[in-house]
Regions:
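Extreme N-terminal basic, low-complexity initiation segments
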Residues: 2-9, 17
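Alpha-helical transmembrane segments and immediately membrane-proximal extracytoplasmic
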Residues: 95, 103, 107-556
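Short, positively charged low-complexity motifs
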Residues: 1, 13, 26, 31-33, ...
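Cationic, low-complexity basic patches in intrinsically disordered or flexible, solvent-exposed regions
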Residues: 54-57, 112
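Intrinsically disordered, low-complexity cationic segments
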Residues: 8, 23, 38, 42, ...
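Residues in intrinsically disordered, low-complexity segments of regulatory proteins
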Residues: 6, 31-34, 43, 140, ...
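Intrinsically disordered, low-complexity segments enriched in serine/threonine/proline/glycine
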Residues: 18, 36-40, 53, 100
């Protein structure tokens, strides 16, 4: 193997060892392109070419990193001597390298500077700028989410404490029930004058999230006052749905104060929903996942995961400090996940799915019947109040007025009246259909717990387990939020029999079809196959997967 050397400056009569020009880097390095080819490599063109290019770029990059000053001349001299010592070897021993020098076009110092700064430092600066921008956005949402949690948390806690006071006061003063029609007139008057377009429905917050339109601030005091009045005078409604409106309206206005874009206001609204739900019920994980998956079923906005979770955690922390205890139960009967028990749970989940369809349709039909019989909202709310007061007097119990938390606890302990779930559905439909305000989720818990307590022994399951499964699975079937339902089971029941809860929720979700508690809830994917769905003539039907697309907002 012969090494060949050709030096431009040797032809000019100068020695590279003893004479280093001022522009030494340009003279010594940039005039020559060299490569080292290991003899032990196989004679494969690709491998040899790769070795050539690798050493070539390594040398030029190392040379370019040296500063341009005369003090570095000895370094170049040493490098030159090392190379020159290798050149006289006409035949390289085994394992040695043959050095081949060939003249190429000159590389000036600007080229080296571009390699050093343009490639390396440029990439570093780009990475640092990208990381700084990314961290700035994360910090922004952490601060905003914390602010929302600190604002919505006390409001949610105050709302929950006010509802507890209202139910306790009504229980101590039964005569308040007969003032329910008058309370209904006040509620209709407030909404007709201060929020004629909103109506105080949970669907309002769904539209706000989907269309990037923050709700008005007056929604918060209206839903607060009207829901407390409904509970105080004996209406049958919940609180979580109202909490979604309360938190969503306040957090949306916070976004407007900071002049956020509509898309950012959407995320702020979701943070408020999670914070208020968590503050009321004490389940931050379920509140976060519920907010992400309930608006558009099949599409979760994971960008809202961290902000919503921060708001939810702060909400439950503040509400606990204010004295509002989180909901939690102890499951007194545990069942092993044997094949027979799994079949029993599947059957119970199917029954709960059918019940969820019936409950949703009942709540949607009641307002239509009221409108057909009573033409004005004032007549409707008075008629509803009279009907509820009459039924309560006829039954001789107030178990079906208000939220019914005591009945839920009794059902989870294994005691429930067989027809209690039917009466609760009737009372809730009469209350909300007439124009009274409140949520639907606690009545769902009541209905599911009492139904499960009655149906479980017929299937061979303990009534305590049946009530717990019914409470969670009916919530899943009505709201179409399976992940939030499983999280709810973990937080409320401490993770006991979680596999059975997950199975019941999955069955209820799949068999409940496209019925929903909320009219503004959209479905993006089929429950049975991996295809999209679209609304045709008011019904959700499957569409061809090839033609199914979603926009940036997750809508079809």
């Amino acid at each position: 193997m012969v090494a060949r050397v050709v030096w431009d400056h040797e032809a000019a009569g100068s020695s590279p060892v003893t004479s280093i020009p001022e522009n030494h880097l340009e003279t010594f390095v940039s005039g020559w392109s060299f490569c080292i080819i290991p003899h032990f490599l196989p004679r494969c063109i690709q491998i040899r070419a790769f070795a050539v290019q690798l050493f070539k770029y390594m040398f030029f990059y190392a040379a370019a990193m040296l500063p341009r000053c005369k003090a570095c001349a000895p370094v170049y001299v040493v490098l030159h001597n090392l190379i020159m010592e290798a050149i006289p070897c006409r035949v390289a021993p085994a394992g040695y390298f043959s050095v081949v020098f060939s003249p190429q076009k000159r590389y000036n110092n600007l080229k080296f500077r571009n390699i050093r700064e343009g490639i390396f430092m440029g990439k570093v600066r780009h990475c640092l700028r990208s990381a700084a921008g990314y961290l700035a956005v994360c910090a922004k949402w952490l601060v905003l989410a914390a602010l929302v949690g600190c604002v919505v948390g006390p409001l949610g806690a105050a709302f929950g404490l006010a509802l507890n006071w209202a139910n306790a006061t009504r229980a101590a003063q039964p005569w308040l029930l007969y003032l329910l029609p008058i309370a209904g007139l006040v509620i209709v008057f407030l909404y007709s004058h201060f929020d004629p377009d909103g109506g105080g429905s949970t669907n309002q917050v769904f539209v706000s999230v989907r269309e990037h339109k923050p709700m008005t601030l007056r929604t918060a005091p209206l839903i607060f006052a009207s829901t407390v009045m409904t509970h105080l005078f004996g209406g049958s409604s919940g609180r979580e749905g109202a909490a979604l409106l309360l938190g969503g309206s306040v957090s949306g206005q916070i976004g407007k104060v900071f002049h956020l874009e509509n898309r950012d206001c959407r995320l702020m609204t979701m943070c408020g929903m999670a914070g208020a739900f968590s503050a009321i019920f004490g389940t931050p994980l379920a509140a976060t996942i519920f907010t992400l998956e309930v608006v558009d079923v099949g599409s979760m906005q994971y960008a809202a995961l961290l902000p919503c979770l921060v708001s939810a955690l702060l909400g439950v922390f503040i509400s606990g400090r204010m004295g509002l205890a989180p909901e939690s139960f102890v499951l007194k009967a545990e069942v092993a996940a044997t094949p027979l028990n799994l079949v029993r749970v599947i059957l119970l989940g199917a029954l709960l799915a059918a019940l969820s369809i019936f409950f949703c349709e009942l709540l949607h039909t009641a307002p239509k019947l009221y409108e057909k019989v009573f033409p004005t909202p004032y007549l409707r709310v008075v008629a509803g109040g009279v009907l509820i007061a009459a039924l309560t007097t006829l039954l001789g119990t107030t178990d079906y007025n208000g939220a019914g938390a005591a009945v839920i606890e009794a059902a989870i302990d294994g005691e429930a009246i067989p027809y209690a779930f039917l009466l609760k559905m009737l009372f809730t439909a009469l209350t909300l259909g007439a124009g009274f305000k409140g949520g639907e989720i606690v009545p769902i818990f009541f209905t599911g717990a009492t139904f499960g307590c009655v149906a479980a022994p017929l299937l061979g399951l303990p009534p305590q387990l049946g009530a717990s499964l019914g409470m969670v699975a009916l919530f899943c079937g009505c709201t179409n939020s399976p992940l939030a339902s499983i999280c709810l089971a973990i937080e409320v029941f401490g993770g006991q029999c979680i596999a059975l809860f997950a199975l019941a929720c999955a069955v209820s979700y799949m068999l409940s079809s496209y019925f929903s508690l909320y009219r503004e809830q959209h479905f993006l994917h089929s429950k049975l196959r991996i295809v999209g769905v679209q609304r045709v003539h008011g019904r959700w039907s499957e569409t061809d997967a090839k033609h199914f697309t979603t926009n940036d907002d997750g809508e079809n």
